């Protein structure tokens, strides 16, 4: 770091798409540092790899949005939220430690919210390679998988909920859309609409 008193924080994730839980993660991290780097994992096919602790992370259905699209989502959401510190958005290949120095300063403080065992694996991996890590236990309030499934349902690629015991209809496409949009920053919804994100996800779920 150019200034020994400056703390450069680092968060990372796939952000497929960037949702309210991710925004809360970044806002917490911003309170722990003077500058924040948001690292996008699975930035391109060369950075995608199978992980035993997170076996679905390389599934194409779980990676519908390209790096530059996620960069736009994150930049738009954080610009609107104003976390109070300068923010940079860069790739971060969590499964390729030999490349980390190209994307995150060696003395950055890696900040992780632990929601599942995979997050502990990542924290341990960072520590094993000499990285400073701070973790906080948290509960998942938004599911990226749930958002993608709702987007696929809106596109008609997956079945709606079956009728209830009284014969009432399952969820409509309008309700599916309202539900996932309520879990995503409005600036991100605008990007997703512009890139036809619902259709993209729907196509992947149909393959």
Label the predicted regions.
Residues 1-207:
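Nucleotidyltransferase catalytic core that binds NTPs
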